[in-house]
Structure formats: C-alpha cells, structure tokens
Amino acid sequence: MSSKFMKSTAVLGTVTLASLLLVACGSKTADKPADSGSSEVKELTVYVDEGYKSYIEEVAKAYEKEAGVKVTLKTGDALGGLDKLSLDNQSGNVPDVMMAPYDRVGSLGSDGQLSEVKLSDGAKTDDTTKSLVTAANGKVYGAPAVIESLVMYYNKDLVKDAPKTFADLENLAKDSKYAFAGEDGKTTAFLADWTNFYYTYGLLAGNGAYVFGQNGKDAKDIGLANDGSIAGINYAKSWYEKWPKGMQDTEGAGNLIQTQFQEGKTAAIIDGPWKAQAFKDAKVNYGVATIPTLPNGKEYAAFGGGKAWVIPQAVKNLEASQKFVDFLVATEQQKVLYDKTNEIPANTEARSYAEGKNDELTTAVIKQFKNTQPLPNISQMSAVWDPAKNMLFDAVSGQKDAKTAANDAVTLIKETIKQKFGE
C-alpha cells in the first residue's frame, strides 16, 4: 500500500491538497439522479490506490461468480480522485465504488459529493468506525474498510521489553548511550513528532483535551485550551527540553526520528503502521506495541483513522453499488483484505481473524485502536490543523507559554471557522 494513502489522515490537515489532474477514473454515467434498480447491471467499476489491486482482483472474481456482475478495476491516485470528485460528479464520469480516508467521508458527504450508504449487519462495525463514517447531519456516507492507529515501535537490540509507561521512557532518557552527538545534555532515547498535531493529539486527549464536542461533530465546542490540553502541552515541552534542536523543525522532525531509529540511536518512537516497511527495509530488529500509559495513568488516546468504501453521488445505479459495498465489508472479503494488504479490517470478526495471525504490528494497532478517539470528519476540521501545529511549536519552543499558545490557537480556529463556514 502506498504510504501516501495510508498516512493521509496524518498529513491532510497540515497541507492544503491541490487539485490534481487525473485521467477519468470511472464508468461514464448520465447526468441524472442515481437509479434505484439493479436488475440490469452487468458491470461495476471500482477505483482504488494501486496497492489494493491484488485484493480487488481476487474479490472481484468471487463477486462475479456470486452476483453475475463483472467488476472492472481502475487504479490511480486515490486522493487525487477524491479532490476532483466534484467535477467528476458534474460530468457523470465517476466510478461506482471508491475508497476514502475517514476524515474525508463526512465532509464530502455533507458537501453532496457522496451517496448515503447503508451499513449492513454483515459489516460488523463498532462504535468508533461507525462514528468515522457518520457526518454531523447523522447520515452515513461510507462503509468502514480499514482501521489505523499510531503505535509504538521499539528496537529489540536496545531494550529487551516494550516500555509500558512514560516513566519507563523517562528512565531510558537518562541512559548516556542515547546522548545526541553535538548537543550536550540532549537525548534520542524516545522520540515523537509532537509538533505534528496528528501525532500529539493522543497525549492531549489522554489528559482530557478534545477537538470538537459531541464526539467530534460540534464545531462550536472546542476543547483544545482546557486544563487537559495545557497539561499535555507542558508534558510535551518537558521532552523537547531533552531532545535535540532539530526536533522543533516542523518539516524535518519526522525524517530525524526515522533516521535515528533506523541507525539504532533511538530505543522507541511513536508512529503509524505505514512506517513498518521502511524499518523492515532498513533491517531494524524492531518490535511493535501499544503506546505507553501516560503519567496520569490514562491511555494515549490517539486519533482513530483508516479508510472506508464510498459511493459517488452521480453513480448510475446506487443499489448495485450498495450491494457491492456490502460484499466488500463482509467478513470473508475483509479477511482477504488483510491477507493481501496486511491492513487491519474494520469488520470486527475479520479483525479477530487478523489478530489471530500473531503479527506484532497487527496486534498493536488493534489494541491501540480500542483507546482511540474518532478523527473528526466534519469540514470544520480543516480549520484546526495549522493553528494546532503553531500552538504546539510556539509552546515547545518557548515562544509562548502553553496556556497562551492554546488560547491563541482556539481563537484562530474559531475565527477561521466563522470566515469559512459562517458559524
């Protein structure tokens, strides 16, 4: 799976995605409302990232045998396809089914770019995944396909067992073997990209912060300047006082963390499942575990993310698309998804199947996902990322105290939401 698509929820908020030119990616449809009947449908088109090709090819054969419907596969830039969905809906040139990161589902649905989706009993959703595909208006615009969460990677050549608490990490930082060359008193024992709000949210939320109220749906209730948020920011700052100056580089810290870990100079890091392949390629003897318990005894409540199957608004036959989505999220097809991609199924029965494979990364993601909070999928979330990044940088660099940085960020978020959304 391309790391670009897998980690989309981590980066979509830090940059504005430009509209990308993409070869038309779907079956041509007439510019008219979706037909509800499916008796005449003989072919469907599904558009996915290249990494899902093998998976779709296998389940497409099964679906053609079961339903008598041929599935045509088109691959390309999945994020680019979402960016130009508005234009494609207008032209009627859309695939019948495609995939979208959860944080795009609610906003695209609310903007009228996606059809409503019914969650079948066979989907075996849980509360978190259902929330991730439900917009603020209460309508469901996707069927959960994959779950993702940040986890902890640790170097088995440096530490025998996975650190269980942040106190364990603090003790590692006292070990002189992790001293950073060239900067006296600095350590790389544990590293986390905590000027990136996606990575830091679990620390803040574990202390009682939240982005929006009502499970991420109420943009008028912002909880990033409460006592919990300030406590989390101050704890992050205590680590930045131990870390090399380069960790404050909002653009380059991620590369620094990866390099230090791959070179055996860092014992533990927080990152996503999309980094596993790079560590394998670098021949790091790594383990994967849940993120350690916070100093307050609470769990690291990272954003729960992943991807869903969605149906564009302009599909010719909504019922036929819905039936194929139901097929894709059923347990057997979700098992195939795991076997072909090693991505964690959203379907809880298939998730148990994946956990039974005794893969460290799989087990860690599944366990960590239980402590996650849904990544808000409302359009107003776009107003959060940059102010939140600035909040973290200003505080950990010492340019502002945590309370001032948090209050300034919330003020800017509210102003931006008012300007963009009239609220």
Curated annotation (Swiss-Prot):
State whether keyword S-adenosyl-L-methionine applies. Answer: no
Please report which positions carry a covalently bound lipid of kind N-palmitoyl cysteine: C25
Question: How does this protein sit in the membrane?
Answer: Lipid-anchor
What PROSITE patterns does the record point to? PROKAR_LIPOPROTEIN, SBP_BACTERIAL_1
Superkingdom of this protein's organism: Bacteria
Where is a lipid covalently linked (S-diacylglycerol cysteine)? C25
Task: Name the positions where substrate binds.
Answer: Y52, D77, D83, D103, R104, E148, D193, N196, E251, G252, A253, G254, W274, K307
InterPro entries membership: Maltose/Cyclodextrin-bd (IPR006060), SBP (IPR006059), SBP_1_CS (IPR006061)
Any one Gene Ontology molecular-function term assigned to this protein's record:
maltoheptaose binding
Q: Which family does it belong to?
A: Belongs to the bacterial solute-binding protein 1 family.
What is the name of the protein in this document?
Maltooligosaccharide ABC transporter solute-binding lipoprotein
Protein source organism: Streptococcus pneumoniae (strain ATCC BAA-255 / R6)
